[in-house]
Amino acid sequence: LKAIRIKLPPQTETLTADILTIDRAWLDERELGNRFNVVLSDMAPATSGNKGLDAARSFQLCQAALSIAEMVLKPGGSFICKIFQDEEFNEFADNVRNRFKHHKIFKPRSSRKQSKEIFIVGMGFKG
């Protein structure tokens, strides 16, 4: 993954890490458990041109983001994640559905018609 720098509001905290290596111990060490109202993942893998491989990598990133969300969200919190839609999408949607009171799936109007990019939103984290 390529880390990028973005300008954030002053009250924002940032952490830099490889999302695929973050676990409960890493979060506990930084006292990050159950502190957040929202987890937003706009991650996407570097695309290879192989749609199946790109979608599988996207699924892996989204599963990692959801795993982190489960550890850091306050009850009632929200999760937003961009994923490339393919055959694993339904599995990911079910994972979100099982952890949140409400969920919504949408494709932004700004996305190209042929793009497999889609967003899933979970609201009301069950904790």
Predicted regions span which residues?
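Class I S-adenosyl-L-methionine
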Residues: 83-127
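Surface-exposed loop/turn positions
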Residues: 12, 76-77
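S-adenosyl-L-methionine
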Residues: 1-47
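Glycine/threonine-rich flexible loop motifs
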Residues: 47-58
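Short amphipathic alpha-helical segments
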Residues: 28, 51-53, 92-94
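A short glycine-rich, Lys/Arg-flanked "PGG" loop and its adjoining helix->strand segment in the class I
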Residues: 57-75
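Short catalytic-loop micro-motif centered on adjacent basic/acidic residues
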Residues: 78-82
